[in-house]
Amino acid sequence: MLRVENLSIRRGGKTVLEGLELELRPGEMLGVLGPNGAGKSTLLGALCGELEPAEGLVLLDERGLDDWPGVARAQRLAVLPQSSSLGFAFPVEAVVGFGRLPHSSGRERDVQIVAEALAAADASHLAGRSYLALSGGERQRVHLARVLAQLWPGEPGQVLLLDEPTSALDPLHQHTTLQAVHDFARRGASVLVILHDLNLAARYCDRLLLLQNGRPHLLGTPEEVLRPEPLRAVFGLEVLVQRHPERGHPLIVAR
């Protein structure tokens, strides 16, 4: 479990994230929403230890991130940044296999996990190809498989952080990707995902954090957060909110 207490981040003498209290629960998928510059990627940088808090704490299983040895932390915490690039023609299986480096599970088990992670990311058909020959969306799915393999099969105490994992994907694979992440959370891992698409967030996330100007504006269920008033206040967007006729979650339509 990952817990944040009174978190503030300063960059270049400016406070870019302030006053955040957050707990990622086992088995939960939490979405982070907000306009450009709201502090979403800054939050992810703080949660993975890349950015040092000016105030507050980030605790992984009640221990500060710096108190974890590198390998032990990598066995519990995986991060998919907004963009991941490799300049070498590694086979797809090797790229996904990088996620197994913190583990000592043996080659046979690692090969099995790589195959299972590729299947979960709907990328099994990419096996055997060179990473450099893939499209942007295919590369994004391979990197998703890599971070899934790092924590596979997912269990309480593990945390997966994803920064816009659907940004390069077509509509079908936006859904298959978020369904894979949702299924991974249901195995017990805690998942935080940064998204821009409000309807995808409504469909797949258990709770949503709405950020505005580096501060939390609202934290709650999709039904609590995705209402006309908060969306107008944060995005300046006039919307209609309806109930999905089949699934029951909020359905947002711009006026």
Curated annotation (Swiss-Prot):
Ranges for the ABC transporter domain? 2-238
Principal location listed in the UniProt entry: membrane
Query: Which residues participate in ATP binding?
Result: 34-41
Task: Tell me the InterPro entries matching this sequence.
Answer: AAA+_ATPase, ABC_transporter-like_ATP-bd, P-loop_NTPase
Q: Which SUPFAM superfamilies match?
A: P-loop containing nucleoside triphosphate hydrolases (SSF52540)
Gene3D superfamilies per the record? P-loop containing nucleotide triphosphate hydrolases (3.40.50.300)
Q: Look at the named UniProt entry and state the broad enzyme category this protein falls under.
A: translocase
Record Pfam families: ABC_tran
Q: Where in the cell is it found?
A: Cell inner membrane
- One Gene Ontology cellular component: plasma membrane
Q: Which GO terms describe its molecular function?
A: ATP binding; ATP hydrolysis activity
For this UniProt record, the keywords arranged alphabetically read as follows: ATP-binding, Cell inner membrane, Cell membrane, Membrane, Nucleotide-binding, Translocase, Transport
Q: Which membrane topology describes this protein?
A: Peripheral membrane protein
Which EC number(s) does UniProt give?
7.6.2.-
Q: Which SMART domains match?
A: AAA (SM00382)
NCBIfam families (UniProt xref): PRK13548.1 (NF010068)
| Similarity comment text for this entry | Belongs to the ABC transporter superfamily. Heme (hemin) importer (TC 3.A.1.14.5) family.
Its quaternary structure? The complex is composed of two ATP-binding proteins (HmuV), two transmembrane proteins (HmuU) and a solute-binding protein (HmuT).
Q: What does this protein do?
A: Part of the ABC transporter complex HmuTUV involved in hemin import. Responsible for energy coupling to the transport system.
Question: What name has this protein been given in UniProt?
Answer: Hemin import ATP-binding protein HmuV
- What is the originating organism of this protein? Pseudomonas aeruginosa (strain ATCC 15692 / DSM 22644 / CIP 104116 / JCM 14847 / LMG 12228 / 1C / PRS 101 / PAO1)
The gene name reads hmuV
